[in-house]
Amino acid sequence: CHLTSKVFRGRESEVVEAAAAAGVSRMISIAVGSEDAKAALALAEADPRVFCSAGVHPLHSDEAIDWDDLHRVGTSPRCVAWGELGLDRHYARPDPATQRRVLDAQLERIVAWTAEGLAKPIVVHSRKAVAELLPVLRESGLPPERFVFHCFTDGPADAEQVLAFGAWISFTGVITFANAPEVAESARLVPLDRVMVETDSPYLSPEPHRKVRPNEPKFVVAVAERLASIHGLAPEVLEARLDENAERFFGLPNDGAA
């Protein structure tokens, strides 16, 4: 989720409490830039149920970046991932060269920070860019199993490429959309030990809440229920597995919650 979004401003605690009431015990506020990472860390330090990441979203790659701030956020135990980073070929701006330059700069720094002892998993943003992005990630030398392709909206062929690379895949409310059957088919392909769910809120409200704006972390329950249906599992069985996966991938504490 993106708890730092302006649509949540002033009601962040209310959003977290609503999620807790729905059974969502922990969440990660994903950063889109260096200033946003600092704001996400402040939320995470104020509430033990919230964690954060540190990175630059490709659609923010033409904005000012303070690499020292990203590094400082990354030193906090409340920061559990680098990113989100990657490439977005759906929009023309920022231009492809700028996106690639910032991606390369981030990966280079993550390699260096990992060598310093700040090894963290990496949240990847990929939109219409899987074939272009995978060689870049491979060339970084970072372990494939430390990457998660978040908010996956591509079809089975791209999902197979990501899985062959060795990365994880995370799905949003898009798997509940009747007009996105290819994404549900991708979800069917992903092994249960390499899958996660998310909201990407305030965006992409899942069915049956699709008309609700903004999307909120509490609605991740609907995403998990749809993934359970795709795999023919009881929701509570899959939800326990998803908790285990998030704990294992992000190093989250095990609080015993469903």
Residue ranges and their predicted role:
Residues 1-258:
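Mid-domain alpha/beta scaffold segments of enzyme catalytic cores
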